[in-house]
């Protein structure tokens, strides 16, 4: 049977408990990308256990606690020669870099994966009966006194799970987007970016499109949604199809054009389907020319903000285009952008400095602008009217 990924110990032997768990994930329909993500979390945990010389099935809450402490202070491994990334805001985009430490979202994902791993082996009878990653023990059930008129709030259930930090989606301003677009070096790259910023599709969804999925006549492109694997047609801008046609004319006769052939190819021989990593490097090169650090996913955020700010487009329509399961996720794009708020605040300070906005200082002579009328005070304290 085909196994997308295997976890090996220092001797090069397959770690059988992880192999069984990954097979179960494959059996319930989890994609290879999910198996890889779970495998990386398990590799981090097993490396910790190998360092402290504790077998995986003898790990206790103490090891889980120490692992949670270690992952907070440990530096992420990096490739040889790669520069150290600093978690400081980029001067162009305002986005902070990934930094040297593990992000709270990474630590939370790791805790959930490891708890699920031990739950699986406990249910299968092949692991310890007590999960080393416990849940939070409370004296009452969750949402015991919840007001039915309010939305349910997420409650922390895992003991060692870090506090969730709501990340603000980043949008590429129109003038900066034009500068990034001007740095793209081929019609294929321009077509890809134009589709991403007009459809709001995820990077992997658009890269997985086939030749027959593009319908210029209806101005639609078909993608397979991440997670649900649902097939959905997405409307795209006219200029995206113009760039697509120029790219197809450039590659005519060089790549196959059957209906089920890939839509996106590399530009050099041997021609192979364009991968996510190649597209990521393409967009990174365009960013580097401007000193920016926007990601491919920021193009999806940009499309979402543009559609959500259109008064003639309902929020439910935006939800359908983006493929969100809950409307509350789409509502994030109704919040003002950070750069817009900063610009408004700076403009306010400029107006105050210019004297066009009245200052709220109390004059030295004369009554305070917030003082009560003397007649009201006389009536209040029983002195009558003057």
Regions found by a protein language model. Give the residues of each.
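Conserved tyrosine-mediated DNA breakage-rejoining catalytic core shared by Y-recombinases
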Residues: 199, 204, 208-242
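N-terminal core-binding DNA-recognition domain of tyrosine recombinases/integrases
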Residues: 18-34, 43-149, 179
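Flexible interdomain linker/hinge and immediately adjacent N-terminus
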Residues: 65, 127-179, 224-227, 265-271
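C-terminal secondary-structure termini that scaffold catalytic or DNA-interacting sites
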Residues: 348-386
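Active-site/catalytic core of tyrosine-dependent DNA strand-transfer enzymes
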Residues: 177, 237-292, 384-386
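Short, basic (Lys/Arg/His-rich) helix/loop patches that form interaction surfaces
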Residues: 280-320, 339
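Basic, Lys/Arg- and aromatic-enriched nucleic-acid-binding interface segment
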Residues: 164-203, 207
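Catalytic-site neighborhood detector that most strongly recognizes the C-terminal catalytic loop/helix
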Residues: 225, 322-347
């Amino acid at each position: 049977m085909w196994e997308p990924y295997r976890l090996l110990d220092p001797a090069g032997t397959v770690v059988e408990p992880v192999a069984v768990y990954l097979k179960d994930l494959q059996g319930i329909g989890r994609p290879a990308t999910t198996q890889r993500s779970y495998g990386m979390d398990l590799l981090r945990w097993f490396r910790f256990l190998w360092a402290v010389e504790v077998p995986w099935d003898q790990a206790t809450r103490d090891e889980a606690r120490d692992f949670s402490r270690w992952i907070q202070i440990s530096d992420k491994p990096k490739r040889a020669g790669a520069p150290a990334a600093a978690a400081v805001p980029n001067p162009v985009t305002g986005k902070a870099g990934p930094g040297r430490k593990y992000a709270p979202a990474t630590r939370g994902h790791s805790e959930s994966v490891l708890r699920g791993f031990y739950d699986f082996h406990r249910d299968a009878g092949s692991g310890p009966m007590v999960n080393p990653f416990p849940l939070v023990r409370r004296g009452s059930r969750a949402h015991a006194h919840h007001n039915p008129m309010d939305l349910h709030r997420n409650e922390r259930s895992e003991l060692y799970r870090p506090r969730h930090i709501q990340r603000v989606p980043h949008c590429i301003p129109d003038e900066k987007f034009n500068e990034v677009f001007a740095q793209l070096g081929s019609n294929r790259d321009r077509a890809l970016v134009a589709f991403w910023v007009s459809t709001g599709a995820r990077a992997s969804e658009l890269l997985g499109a086939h030749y027959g999925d593009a319908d210029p006549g209806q101005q639609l492109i078909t993608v397979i949604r991440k997670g649900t694997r649902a097939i959905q047609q997405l409307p795209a801008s006219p200029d995206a199809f113009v760039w697509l046609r120029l790219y197809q004319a450039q590659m005519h006769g060089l790549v196959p054009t059957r209906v089920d052939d890939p839509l996106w190819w590399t530009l050099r021989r041997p021609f192979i389907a364009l991968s996510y990593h190649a597209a990521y490097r393409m967009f990174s090169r365009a960013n580097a020319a401007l000193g920016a650090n926007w990601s491919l996913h920021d193009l999806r955020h940009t499309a979402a903000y543009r559609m959500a700010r259109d008064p003639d487009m309902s929020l439910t329509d935006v939800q359908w285009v983006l493929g969100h399961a809950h409307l509350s996720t789409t509502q994030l794009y109704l919040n003002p952008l950070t750069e817009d708020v900063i610009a408004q605040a700076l403009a306010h300070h400029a107006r105050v400095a210019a004297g066009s906005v009245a200052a709220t200082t109390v004059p030295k002579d004369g009554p305070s602008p917030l003082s009560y009328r003397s007649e009201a005070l006389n009536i209040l304290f029983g002195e009558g009217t003057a």
